[in-house]
């Protein structure tokens, strides 16, 4: 598979191509940990969700959590990936205080999921296909706390043993925009599947980003890994900063050292942490306490049959069934909750074919716009899907105009209430009586003879007359009827 061309970076010696691969660590949505029955609940008191297995007490043996296996397979299917019916757990050996076993149980040569791909949407309607190298299961380590004492570090093992899916991409990403789009799309897929909540603030989704630079078409450069980035915007900033650093070093005659770095968002730069380890440094070998993980194709087929509709499928359906533009459909399906809200609006409409596109416009422009302005999410929207559907239906029926609909939306947002009852009680119905509209049109034309003469020479001035009629009618006149009457009477 050929990577999609990205934005080249300018250097003193010309253009440079950035080559990016990513390792996403996604915490598996499961009530208990990968190899123990301890809770995975976030936010408990330190060391309150810990079993004897998690802290490697002598004689304690790991037992695989079948739900975590199911979630990994479901994720692999969602990534259009090969599911391996036999996989092996290995010990990844390194010593660090947050890993009480002295090793991490992971998967090395035989992961549970093989190659797949993710298609991401880019600016300008472009797309890029990013290859997935593999997905494997492993344990999350505990958490070191260095700010509790001036002389001591503490360890919270609540997270230790929580199941992680490490999703490794191929080096197909070519710029910061593609990197952000990839993580955004991957997080969306995981949320649709219900296999990871994707909450980067809580550490449920973390990214390690491998960056190298080269002259376009040249051999791959030496890569550096930027660890544990917990924000999509920071991912873009880190890629830009690290690529710029490498370009400057090479153009100054230096060489890039393969190392692990971290991103400092306050200074907008990456800093060295340690030299980059190779696989042999970890002395992987199969875990003798765990048998190879094996299941049959029927197990996979049953999970595949029960998968929900994923973002790409939902987007295609919205375009085909409701005539939405690819952009509007992408906005609606980006988050599972947004798509569900739109579909709830559609369910409440009697004429979805007529009002589906109008409903999308109102969800995206009016509702999302207002939610973003006030820093709310869809779950806390003061306007329900049923209320928004009623507003859309009133427009579609011709009961209210678009302008009146915006006023109605403000009332429902601030005060609540049934939109149909509000239209009746507040006299907001659109005027469709041609005689009444014609009377207003005649009055406006009679009062502005100079504008009439100008409009005959410049037909675009008809818009001024439309505005005056709508103003005079309090926004209640049917806009199409106003347009038709004005064109007829002005002879344009």
Swiss-Prot record:
<protein>
    <recommendedName>
        <fullName>Aspartyl/glutamyl-tRNA(Asn/Gln) amidotransferase subunit B</fullName>
        <ecNumber>6.3.5.-</ecNumber>
    </recommendedName>
</protein>
<dbReference type="Pfam" id="PF02934">
    <property type="entry name" value="GatB_N"/>
</dbReference>
<dbReference type="InterPro" id="IPR042114">
    <property type="entry name" value="GatB_C_1"/>
</dbReference>
<dbReference type="InterPro" id="IPR018027">
    <property type="entry name" value="Asn/Gln_amidotransferase"/>
</dbReference>
<dbReference type="GO" id="GO:0006412">
    <property type="term" value="P:translation"/>
</dbReference>
<dbReference type="GO" id="GO:0050566">
    <property type="term" value="F:asparaginyl-tRNA synthase (glutamine-hydrolyzing) activity"/>
</dbReference>
<keyword id="KW-0547">Nucleotide-binding</keyword>
<dbReference type="InterPro" id="IPR023168">
    <property type="entry name" value="GatB_Yqey_C_2"/>
</dbReference>
<dbReference type="InterPro" id="IPR017959">
    <property type="entry name" value="Asn/Gln-tRNA_amidoTrfase_suB/E"/>
</dbReference>
<dbReference type="InterPro" id="IPR017958">
    <property type="entry name" value="Gln-tRNA_amidoTrfase_suB_CS"/>
</dbReference>
<dbReference type="GO" id="GO:0050567">
    <property type="term" value="F:glutaminyl-tRNA synthase (glutamine-hydrolyzing) activity"/>
</dbReference>
<dbReference type="Pfam" id="PF02637">
    <property type="entry name" value="GatB_Yqey"/>
</dbReference>
<dbReference type="InterPro" id="IPR003789">
    <property type="entry name" value="Asn/Gln_tRNA_amidoTrase-B-like"/>
</dbReference>
<dbReference type="InterPro" id="IPR006075">
    <property type="entry name" value="Asn/Gln-tRNA_Trfase_suB/E_cat"/>
</dbReference>
<dbReference type="InterPro" id="IPR014746">
    <property type="entry name" value="Gln_synth/guanido_kin_cat_dom"/>
</dbReference>
<comment type="subunit">
    <text>Heterotrimer of A, B and C subunits.</text>
</comment>
<comment type="similarity">
    <text>Belongs to the GatB/GatE family. GatB subfamily.</text>
</comment>
<dbReference type="GO" id="GO:0005524">
    <property type="term" value="F:ATP binding"/>
</dbReference>
<dbReference type="GO" id="GO:0070681">
    <property type="term" value="P:glutaminyl-tRNAGln biosynthesis via transamidation"/>
</dbReference>
<keyword id="KW-0067">ATP-binding</keyword>
<dbReference type="InterPro" id="IPR004413">
    <property type="entry name" value="GatB"/>
</dbReference>
<comment type="function">
    <text>Allows the formation of correctly charged Asn-tRNA(Asn) or Gln-tRNA(Gln) through the transamidation of misacylated Asp-tRNA(Asn) or Glu-tRNA(Gln) in organisms which lack either or both of asparaginyl-tRNA or glutaminyl-tRNA synthetases. The reaction takes place in the presence of glutamine and ATP through an activated phospho-Asp-tRNA(Asn) or phospho-Glu-tRNA(Gln).</text>
</comment>
<keyword id="KW-0436">Ligase</keyword>
<keyword id="KW-0648">Protein biosynthesis</keyword>
